[in-house]
């Protein structure tokens, strides 16, 4: 089971309450529909957000970014999120 910090739990509650977004977490070893999602942030269906590596800093960046978006993320938006993460957190 993944342990989330208090800060991460607070962000999760905000996202779920105000964005009506169900969030699922995956570790580095997880596979989703046979596809590796290491380091990915994927909104696979309306209202369901799947995040890999929630134990890393990108969890907070992803939630903050996605909190302002109600539509399904495009591939380009996912790239933009990862680009932001790599350039601001790494």
UniProtKB/Swiss-Prot annotation:
Lineage: superkingdom: Viruses
What is the protein name given in its UniProt record?
E22 protein
Query: Which species?
Result: Bacillus phage SP01 (Bacteriophage SP01)
Name of the coding gene: 43
